[in-house]
């Protein structure tokens, strides 16, 4: 599993003109773009969610857990693109939807269980993600 994390001051996801997820942090929140690969499981999703929740990347070296910062979770299979050969990416390392969707859901559910305010995109949809990156701070978490 890969989670591309961005520290933000605002973020929202729109599908077909409808806002399906939005966070309005005060002052900061996180956007987590989540990619799932073969071999990932519920334990992987839970461990990375816990790491994200406690990761000290907000102002004052504090975490989302410390500040109650909201998190927008968006599935993104393209995090597993293989661009080593040719000009067309291969997606073979990305888990198929029926495998990936429950794990992205488990990731978001774990964050909620830990106390996070979580908004989400819509799995499998063509999404428009708008965010204001703060810093900028962008990190890649991997299992």
Curated annotation (Swiss-Prot):
Keywords, alphabetical: Cytoplasm, Hydrolase, RNA-binding, tRNA-binding
Gene3D superfamilies, per database record: D-tyrosyl-tRNA(Tyr) deacylase
SUPFAM superfamilies reported for this sequence: DTD-like
Intracellular or extracellular location(s): Cytoplasm
Enzymatic class: hydrolase
GO MF annotation terms: D-tyrosyl-tRNA(Tyr) deacylase activity; Gly-tRNA(Ala) deacylase activity; Ser(Gly)-tRNA(Ala) hydrolase activity; tRNA binding
Name of the protein in question: D-aminoacyl-tRNA deacylase
